[in-house]
């Protein structure tokens, strides 16, 4: 990097700073990503008890007040890795300072769709690039599948349709184009009280049948995808680290016929996602369009909101049905 831009991470929790034990070639955190990519990590901002230890680990200053940090550090790039409930207000404060060249936000972008729309509009008005960290956008194996036509896809997830579910929705938009329709089938509350995990059926431009299969985060953590095309199949599992590819063979199997046969098993490159993100930020500062923009985040959150509302409406209908049956 020819220019060591000043960077700051707001949020010293797991994805902000804590998951990495220190400097790594394959960082998991925003702090680790900035250091690995050669940026000048100036500060961490948080109100938690672990702030001082995390800041010391990265050789950065510790701030408990965002406004003070902005005045003293004048960061050029900021990562917001705090909960969605407080993220939008801090991101708007950042726009009051002309030092900011780009911002990275964790997902979901905001606590509500209206808040996200207002936030993106504010960044657009100030002409400050906004990158949303839907991490699969920065994984080589997924990037290699962009534009593919598929017959069907199944993605298994848990921990909320707006939180982890939007990872799946954004992935489908990246691979298959815009969503044409969506319908909630069932759901459960497995982690967030205000964000159910919804099982849903969706249709996209290049994949007419997508099943989001909602699991239960209280049982285990899982996110995997199974995509089937006219002459191929791709399975990504093992925390997104493994990709298995199958291709069409004639006269294969018993009895002989047209079958999908495993061709390869490889690492997806997911371990480089954070570092790729940080390298992408520099390109965005130089004029490149973000791989995942605020508009992309809004599109996924819109779909997730419709699915959440659809599920909640179905639950209300069921409750009223039970009530009327009981009083007949």
Model-derived segments and their meaning:
Residues 1-57:
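N-terminal Rossmann-like dinucleotide-binding module
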Residues 1-5, 53, 77-82, 280-328:
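C-terminal helix-rich "cap/oligomerization" subdomain common to oxidoreductases
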Residues 10-13, 129-192, 314:
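Predominantly a Rossmann-like dinucleotide-binding segment in NAD(P)-dependent oxidoreductases
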Residues 61-66:
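Short acidic-hydrophobic, aromatic-tinged amphipathic segments that line or gate anion-handling sites
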Residues 69-89:
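Rossmann-like NAD(P)-binding element
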Residues 76-77, 88-134:
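Beta-strand-loop-alpha-helix segment that lines the small-molecule cofactor/substrate pocket
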Residues 166-248, 267-289, 304-308, 322-328:
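Contiguous beta-strand/loop segments that form the cofactor/metal-binding neighborhood of enzyme cores
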